[in-house]
Every structure is written in C-alpha cells, then in structure tokens.
C-alpha cells in the first residue's frame, strides 16, 4: 500500500498561487501551525482562506494576512486581528463575514456534496444581500450555498499510518468537517502511531478522507 506519510517540504508541492484553502482552528487552537508556516515560507500569494477566524497577528492564519499573502478571507470573526480589519478597510483584501453556524454548515454541505441549505439566520440584514430567499410555511429563509476548497490543512491529536484521526478537546473544532470539503486534505498530527493502536470508537475522521500525513520532528 502506498504510504500517506510526507515531510513538510513535500507538502509545499501542493501550494499554488490563487488557491482556495480551508484551515482548521479556533483562535489558533487546533490550527496546523507547521503547515501554515510552510505555506507562508513557500511564497505563494493571492490565496482565498476559509477559516473560523483570523486569530491574532502572530497566531493561526494571522501571519499569512500580515505578510500580504491573502486576497480573500471567508470567516466568522476577525476582531482579534487588527491587520485583517485594516486590510479590509483599505481594500487590500476582501473579507466575507459569515455567521459561525452558517459557515460550518456551508462547509459540511460542501463535504457532503449537497447543493446548499436553508436558514433564517441573516434574513433582513446585510447577510441577505445578493442571496436567494424562499418563503416556506410563511417564514423567509436564505439559501446558503456550499463551500469547498482546493486544499484543506487540518490538525489532529493522534493519527495512525492510514490517516485515521482523533482530536483533543477544543482543538477538534472545525477540523473534522474541513477534512471532508477539499480536493486534497493534509493533516498535521501531534502524535503518529501505528495502524491498530487507535481505539475504533475514538476515531473521528476516517483515513479514507485523508490524502497525506505530515511528519516532522515534532510528531512523536
């Protein structure tokens, strides 16, 4: 069987200018920091990033924004990273703010191959602008379309050599659903174990949806 293991250097071969990339994490917790650093050092530009938030200037996906590598961000929160706001106001970067529940459901729909979903969230607000609305049973709903990416960068706690993943506490956040919603998914595990060492009922993400496992000195 072909191995899924690869180095960070190998992973940079997937990075291209203009890509749409989903990145796991919540204020940097559960973000694949070594993959983000490799993405920054690769020099790629004009990225569209889909993430829960833009974290801080030196945390999570923040350094990608600070260094001008991002053309567009789709996220639910940017308030802790002043550079995101500055670039949005100046017109240097496009920012699409999405309610958090809507964002994760868009990602889930992208992973499940669905055409979208109906939600009342945002009706009558700026969120509604440019979107199709439907009236069902006397209630107005927004049609939210699915989100997918060229590449997903996720982090897991433990990973076996087939790519089966477990997560730790709040570091789980968006990672399991992001893993499903991209053409290629790269995982950065805290710990790499042999196949068979993970308890089946502890596995959250099956190895079938993981394309490559990033190994480094930090992966025990």
Swiss-Prot record:
Pathway: Lipid metabolism; short-chain fatty acid metabolism. It catalyses: an acyl-CoA + acetate = a carboxylate + acetyl-CoA; acetoacetate + acetyl-CoA = acetoacetyl-CoA + acetate; butanoate + acetyl-CoA = butanoyl-CoA + acetate; acetoacetate + butanoyl-CoA = acetoacetyl-CoA + butanoate. GO terms for molecular function: acetate CoA-transferase activity; butyrate-acetoacetate CoA-transferase activity; CoA-transferase activity. The keyword DNA repair does not apply. Its EC number is 2.8.3.8. Keywords: Cytoplasm, Fatty acid metabolism, Lipid metabolism, Transferase. Induction: Transcriptionally regulated by the regulatory protein AtoC. GO terms for cellular component: cytoplasm. Inhibited by p-chloromercuribenzoate. It is an enzyme of class 2 (transferase). One of its GO terms (biological process) is short-chain fatty acid metabolic process. It is found in: Cytoplasm. It holds the Pfam family CoA_trans. CoA binds at residues 24-30. Coiled coil: none annotated. Disruption phenotype: Mutant lacks acetoacetyl-CoA transferase activity. InterPro entries: 3-oxoacid_CoA-transf_A, CoA_trans_fam_I, CoA_transf_BS, NagB/RpiA_transferase-like. Coenzyme A transferase which is involved in short-chain fatty acid degradation and catalyzes the activation of short-chain fatty acids to their respective CoA thiolesters. During acetoacetate degradation, catalyzes the transfer of CoA from acetyl-CoA to acetoacetate by a mechanism involving a covalent enzyme-CoA compound as a reaction intermediate. Utilizes a variety of short chain acyl-CoA and carboxylic acid substrates but exhibits maximal activity with normal and 3-keto substrates. Heterotetramer composed of two alpha subunits (AtoD) and two beta subunits (AtoA). Belongs to the 3-oxoacid CoA-transferase subunit A family. This is Acetate CoA-transferase subunit alpha. It comes from Escherichia coli (strain K12).
């Amino acid at each position: 069987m072909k191995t899924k293991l690869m180095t960070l250097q190998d992973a940079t071969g997937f990075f291209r200018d203009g890509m749409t990339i989903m990145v796991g994490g919540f204020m940097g917790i559960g973000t694949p920091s070594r993959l983000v650093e490799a993405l920054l050092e690769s020099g790629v530009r004009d990225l569209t990033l889909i993430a829960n938030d833009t974290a801080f200037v030196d945390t999570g996906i923040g350094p990608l924004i600070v260094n001008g590598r991002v053309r567009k961000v789709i996220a639910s929160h940017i308030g802790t990273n002043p550079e995101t706001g500055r670039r949005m106001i100046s017109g240097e970067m496009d920012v699409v703010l999405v309610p958090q529940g809507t964002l994760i459901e868009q990602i889930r729909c992208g992973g499940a191959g669905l055409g979208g979903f109906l939600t009342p969230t945002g009706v009558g607000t700026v969120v509604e602008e440019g979107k199709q609305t439907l009236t069902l049973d006397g209630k107005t709903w927004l049609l939210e379309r699915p989100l997918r990416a060229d590449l997903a960068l996720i982090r897991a706690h433990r990973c076996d050599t087939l790519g089966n993943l477990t997560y730790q506490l709040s570091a789980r956040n968006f990672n399991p659903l992001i893993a499903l919603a991209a053409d290629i998914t790269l995982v950065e595990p805290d710990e790499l174990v042999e196949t068979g060492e993970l308890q089946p009922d502890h596995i959250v993400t099956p190895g079938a949806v993981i394309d490559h496992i990033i190994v480094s000195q930090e992966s025990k």
